[in-house]
């Protein structure tokens, strides 16, 4: 399935991207079964968008629960997090 995650960042997009693309964090996502198809920043509404392919929403929920420290380091404002699961 495809999931679109959208959120605001507290430390800026470039900082978020640096943490998100860190080799160890990329490996954690791969091991969890999360494949990132695209990512980007919409300056007009100040939101980051990440398009992911995964088996189920449970996969991303478990991955996020296990990586809360890294998510906080990246500056993700969890109060703005939106997940949109797309089913074919």
Write out the residue ranges for each language-model feature.
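Short S/T/G/P-rich N-terminal loop/turn motif that feeds into the first structured element of a domain
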Residues: 1-88
């Amino acid at each position: 399935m495809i999931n679109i995650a959208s959120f605001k960042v507290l430390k800026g997009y470039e900082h978020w991207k640096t943490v998100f693309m860190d080799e160890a964090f990329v490996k954690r996502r791969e091991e969890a079964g999360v494949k990132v198809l695209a990512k980007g920043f919409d300056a007009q509404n100040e939101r980051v968008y990440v398009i992911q392919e995964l088996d189920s929403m449970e996969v991303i929920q478990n991955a996020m629960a296990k990586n809360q420290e890294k998510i906080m380091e990246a500056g993700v404002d969890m109060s703005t997090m939106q997940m949109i699961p797309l089913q074919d």
